[in-house]
A protein has these predicted regions:
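Active-site anion-handling motifs in enzyme catalytic cores
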Residues: 1-284
Length: 284
């Protein structure tokens, strides 16, 4: 079964699960970079396409809002991670006390973080995982399930977003992390500041972020959702995992053998050879 058939299967199953809920609230105003906006946009498109009615509640109001007959729907996130867990697990705990049910849409989880385990262990919390490693780590905690990341439900081919004529000779778009998610510094390297564009931090809206990717033929990145967008926009993707197997695990589950002609995993030495990264002493 190819990616598109599997996506439809997961989309229909997820919508069926959500439709069983009444008085649905969607969590909004979540902290994150522009890449996270792709998840939120895909989530809204999923709900609208399924004719699911929902109200919105900002993340800052969850702790002080009692909706004992309502369900809170939390968009997928990477904020259950060792590096970023300062707000979302606490939000889940507060919501589990104030809402009848809490559904966490497909996310990645790090169960080495105690507050993550505590939040997912609440009896009325239903977490979805977006890749197999996370699912296997949480399935013993609660009502866990596996599903495609909602970013994959985003429609990149809406009217007005058709591809422009792309210059085949244009240099690849280099998008290497410049935040705490990058381990380049611990290995003595940094992104080449002359050519690196960490668009998840530097663009101001999702449309601009997508346009940056749309207007090239090749993307080199260690950012997950930059990679997802590149693949679904038909670009050549060259990626490296920022830590662990973050992108590799996700791509293996989501894309399987689909798009294998578009996706290439690279190494630090390859990035060095192409001057995409520099030793820190040369970049000081």
């Amino acid at each position: 079964m190819d990616f598109f058939a599997r996506r439809k299967l997961y989309r229909d199953a997820l919508l069926s699960f959500i439709r069983a809920e009444s008085d649905l609230y969607l969590l909004t105003d979540m902290p994150g970079n522009i890449g996270d906006h792709l998840i939120c946009a895909g989530t809204r498109e999923l709900l609208v396409s399924g004719n699911i009615r929902f109200k919105c509640i900002p993340v800052g109001k969850v702790a002080n809002t009692a909706r004992k007959s309502s369900t809170l729907l939390i968009p997928g996130s990477g904020a259950f991670d060792q590096r970023w867990h300062e707000w979302l697990p606490d939000t889940v705990l507060a919501a589990s006390n104030n809402f009848r049910r809490v559904i966490i849409l497909p996310s990645s989880y790090d169960v080495s973080v105690p507050i993550v385990v505590k939040s997912l262990s609440q009896r009325n919390v239903f977490p979805f995982a977006r890749e197999v490693k996370s699912y296997l780590s949480i399935k013993h905690l609660n009502h866990a399930a596996l599903c495609f990341d909602c970013a994959t439900f985003f429609n990149f081919n809406e009217p007005g977003t058709t591809d422009l004529r792309v210059d085949e000779a244009k240099a690849p778009l280099l998008v290497l992390r410049e935040d705490a998610g990058s381990l380049l510094g611990t290995q003595g390297y940094a992104p080449n500041p002359v050519i690196n564009q960490d668009i998840s931090l530097t663009t101001t809206c999702l449309d601009d972020w997508i346009t940056k990717i749309r207007n090239v033929t090749t993307v080199v990145t260690d950012r997950l959702h930059v990679g997802v967008a590149a693949v679904l926009l038909g670009k050549q993707l060259v990626y490296i995992d920022p830590y662990g197997e973050k992108l590799s695990t996700y791509f293996k589950y989501t894309f399987r053998e689909s798009f294998k002609d578009r996706i290439t995993r690279c190494s630090l030495s390859w990035l060095m050879e192409n001057k995409y990264i520099l030793p820190v002493k040369e970049n000081a």
